[in-house]
Amino acid sequence: MADLRVEMSSEKERIKKDRAKSASEEGVGVSYGAVLTLLAGTAVLAAAVYYPNSLIVGELRTLVEKIENQTKPTDHPTPRDCYDIRAQNPNSTSGVYTVYPGAIRRGLDVLCDMDVDEGGWLVIQKRSDGSLDFFRDWTEYQFGFSNQLRELWLGNEYLHLLTSQSMYELRVDMTDFEGESRFAKYKLFQVGSRDTKFRLTVGGYSGTAGDSLSPHHGMLFSTKDVDNDQASGQCAVSFKGGFWYSNCHTANPNGQYLKGEHESMADGVNWKTWRGYKYSLQTITMMIKPL
């Protein structure tokens, strides 16, 4: 636990430095864009004088327009996550919103929960009715998939973008088929880049469901076609999902939707510390927001 606290502290300092660096780079980027605009504009004038009928003039004008569009400041701040949306409008309701993690230009449509635990939560995973197959390959987990947002996996690339821009906490809400509910919260949640095989950093548990996720701390992501676990076999194949498997799991939120008690071992939507390895939960939702 002491090692985890040290890691959380160092991670917090790293993110602060990265955000400061990012802000500095953004400022440099605008100045650089202005210089590019000036140079390209000068080139347009020169080309118009020496090559009045040339296609170069039109091409350079197009370049100037592109640079100007890329460097124009936005009229309104763009939300990075659901917490920003809630902060900008305290009356926001749960639903789909567009966010811009890592300053991606085209935006990302996400499901926001504005009701649970003071709201501002961004849903990264959801199981509710078994309508979607989660036994998928690496690329699908990398970029995400959903079924009209009834069930979804946001995508590992987006998880990395989101959790690299600030310190995030994770909340996992779950229910069984007998109508009982439990939750687990983690004060630290981060997903590494694809170069790290989306390495998981998680810790600081509290809640009522028991801590089934901390044993996955430091694990790499595995799917049925990419084996990064610590077992001799393939955990993703054996337990029918994609996750940060170790040897193999104590949490399997992306397993088969088996509707309660099942005879097979640990291949359902399992949370070991609550209902064990032979009970598949009715619902489970993983959500994040910045600390």
What are these regions (language model features)?
Residues 143-147, 151-153, 248, 253-259:
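Short secondary-structure subsegments characteristic of cysteine-rich extracellular domains
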Residues 2-118, 179:
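Assembly "stalks" and propeptides
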